[in-house]
Design a protein with these regions (language model features):
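Glycine-rich phosphate-binding loops of nucleotide-dependent enzymes
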Residues: 2-516
Length: 516
């Protein structure tokens, strides 16, 4: 159906009344990533796509956006067979994609970012005034309020996401794919995004909403498709879905989504920060006079939008970043700027944010990574010189069994494991030392819902054993589910602290943006 025959969207572009993917197959060496998957999106609906890591979501959407090409199957737009060869081809067919990590140039303005890669209406001369005017028109239509003349670096995260949506609409997207669109947003920004998505759907756009947050899927979508192991499990109306039902469809078994925590049995202070300051990687203020106390037997959650000092906080405590002012004490001993080895020796363990950079050596085996920090311990060596490989393998096998790590053997290279199993290995190693203080930074980022459930249970068990746990996470659901207290960071400072007892999500959201 031609654009002149088809109904137009408010943006003046042709509507995609229906898009259907039938029998889609995609093979990679040794892997069947998509196994005869059927998926469709209709005009005016928000269709959620759920599944664990490796379930096939990204592969399916990359084929729809022209990044991959299906080995078998068919894509039809408005009942017409369509071959999508590249992202440019996808855009020409009215398909846009909003990536989880924004594809924007920070030093350029909003208008310049939107104009990138597009032909000017004036030949070799820039037409940024035309682009800016069109951006303002789209902003008014969809309530995407952004100043086209501002550079990207001056915009908040939620505003940058609006720029991505505006860019897709400017290029004529009738169908939008949104990959984890709420991952870095505050609750208020999520509410604003959902209003925009509902308006887009009401105006005739089709939307694919990829998320791991089940409550958001239930709130925003009309239908839900669940993938598992490269196959479609089912597609159901959202009105017939519940969180437990969706989780079971994703994993193939019942999943515990809410935890009954034992009453808090807090002990003495184990970790204390007093007016700690530090520089960021850019040489600017990373931490600004942060004070915090953490007692044994409690979990303190650190909430905040990414980039507000959380990484610097974890690194200052664990000896990986210089403290420029203030002090850090563990069990009453001043450990300010102590090396990591000294901190390990006094019972501090660390689950790092970047597991593949700071947590493991991917070219090493599972067993070698398990004893990475303790390989010189007397239980693994003779006279601290000769390594006892049999004892190392035995200890690693016990950890594999206890922490349900899926690996062919202790000699398997870590790079061959899934993200969830690598995270379990890091957790097993850090807990094997029976720590008094545990710093857990983004412990379930990029991890399947089944592995997330397991890691959460382990953290709660450590809490009950008396371990003092600092949980740093950008996932408010995780923070609220596990924490006894919640501190909020903004621009390198702790701007508020609340007891996690029927905590007000709106209050947390305001604190995360520097409000009161």
């Amino acid at each position: 159906m031609s654009q002149t025959e088809n109904q137009l969207l408010p943006t003046g572009h042709a509507r995609i009344d229906s898009l259907t993917m039938s029998g889609i197959v995609k093979r990679f060496p040794g892997v069947l990533a998509a196994d005869e998957i059927d998926f469709d999106v209709r005009s005016g609906e928000i269709h959620a796509l759920l599944g664990e890591n490796g379930a096939g979501k990204s592969t399916l959407m990359k084929m729809l956006y022209g990044l991959y090409h299906p080995d078998e199957g068919e894509i039809r737009i408005n009942d017409a067979p369509t071959i999508i060869k590249s992202p440019i081809d996808a855009i020409q067919h009215g398909i846009g994609m909003i990536h989880q990590h924004f594809m924007l140039v920070p030093s350029l303005t909003v208008a310049e970012n939107i104009a990138l890669g597009m032909k000017s209406s004036r030949g070799f001369q820039l037409d940024l005034d035309v682009v800016s005017q069109r951006v303002l028109e789209l902003s008014d239509i969809y309530n995407l309020k952004v100043d086209p003349h501002l550079p990207i670096w001056q915009l908040a995260v939620g505003e940058q996401q609006r720029v991505e949506i505006l860019r897709a609409l400017y290029k004529g997207a009738a169908l939008l794919i949104l990959d984890e669109p709420t991952a870095v947003l505050t609750p208020q920004e999520v509410d604003g995004l959902f209003r925009i998505l509902n308006q887009l759907a009401a105006d005739g756009h089709g939307l694919v909403f990829i998320s791991h947050k089940l409550h958001e899927v239930l709130e925003i979508s009309h239908r839900v498709t669940v993938l598992r192991d490269g196959r479609r499990v089912n597609t159901i109306p959202t009105s017939q879905a519940t969180r437990p039902k969706l989780a079971e469809m994703m994993v193939g078994r019942p999943v515990l989504l809410e935890y009954e925590k034992n009453p808090l049995q807090a002990r003495d202070d184990r970790l204390a920060l007093q007016d700690v300051s530090a520089l960021s990687n850019r040489g600017t203020t990373g931490l600004d006079a942060v004070s915090l106390q953490l007692r044994g037997g409690e979990i303190v959650g650190i909430a905040g939008v990414s980039g507000n000092g959380q990484q610097e906080l974890a690194q200052c405590i664990t000896g990986l970043r210089e403290v420029t002012a203030g002090s850090v004490t563990v069990d009453g001993s001043d450990v300010t700027n102590a090396p990591p080895a000294a901190l390990h020796a006094i019972g501090l363990s660390y689950i790092p944010e970047e597991r593949m950079i700071d947590g493991v050596i991917k070219e090493f085996s599972v067993a070698e990574n398990y004893v990475l920090q303790d390989h010189g311990h007397p239980k693994y060596t003779t006279a601290r010189i000769f390594m006892l490989f049999n004892k190392i393998r035995q200890a690693c096998r016990r950890a594999i069994q206890q922490f349900e790590i899926k690996t062919p053997s202790t000699e398997t290279l870590v790079k061959s494991l899934s993200g969830g199993n690598i995270q379990k290995l890091v957790l097993a190693r850090e807990l094997s030392r029976d720590p008094g203080v545990l710093i857990a930074a983004q412990p379930t980022r990029g991890v399947d819902i089944g592995a997330t459930e397991y890691i959460h249970k382990q953290l709660l068990e450590e809490r009950d054993k008396g371990t003092a746990i600092l949980l740093i996470s950008e996932d408010l659901d995780e923070i609220r589910a596990l924490s006894d207290r919640i501190a909020v960071m903004y621009e390198g400072r702790i701007v508020g602290e609340v007891v996690n007892d029927n905590v007000d999500v709106e209050q947390l959201g305001l604190l995360m943006t520097g409000g009161v």
